[in-house]
Amino acid sequence: VRIGQAIGIEKYKKFLNDLDLINSIQFDIEEMGKPIPFNWGKCKLATTSYGHGITTTILQLTSAYSTIANGGFRINPTLIKKEKYVKGERILEENVSSNLVSILRKIVTTKEGTATLANVEGYEVAGKTGTAEKILEGGYSRKKINTFASVFPASNPKYSLVVMLDEPKTNSEYVYNYRDGSGIKYKGTPFNTAGWTSVEVVGQIIEKIG
């Protein structure tokens, strides 16, 4: 929140717009989903600074992570394969892009990270989890939407992969040593946060198509 306050509304709003997270984007086909408009203020600045209070689409989130990971150049998503892609305008300095990818990599590789189930050997996956309570009229539901946005390989990012699961369910005896055998077997109330659901799906996708 303090970082958001230090940046200020106008600069932060411009940054989110530059990443195409809160504005409609140009695409080959019309998107069904679009970000919900909102009014900026001190409270909105505070909540958006830690990931709450805004909506976006999976396509826009994927595009934003691609921009963050590719050295900071804006991505224009397309379904058409081209012989040569023209770089968009620079949104981030290269050193900022590199530092952000390093942080995202630690979320996958460190014990304290929330995305260790995506640590597929040889692919250097980096990314960030998101667990959101579904909105109800006048409040929030206990049901969740889980997201994991990833880029890989971290040393030279080439791919972005985002998985969103709507109201996921988790096996209560899920084996946490899924990757390297060093974890524990959990018994009890199932975890249904992104680290146990969307992250696992991303890891399995990368393993199968890699």
List each language-model region with its residue ranges.
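Beta-lactam-recognizing serine transpeptidase/beta-lactamase-like catalytic domain environment
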Residues: 1-180, 194
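Short, gly/Ser/Thr-rich active-site loops of penicillin-recognizing serine hydrolases
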Residues: 85-88, 180-210
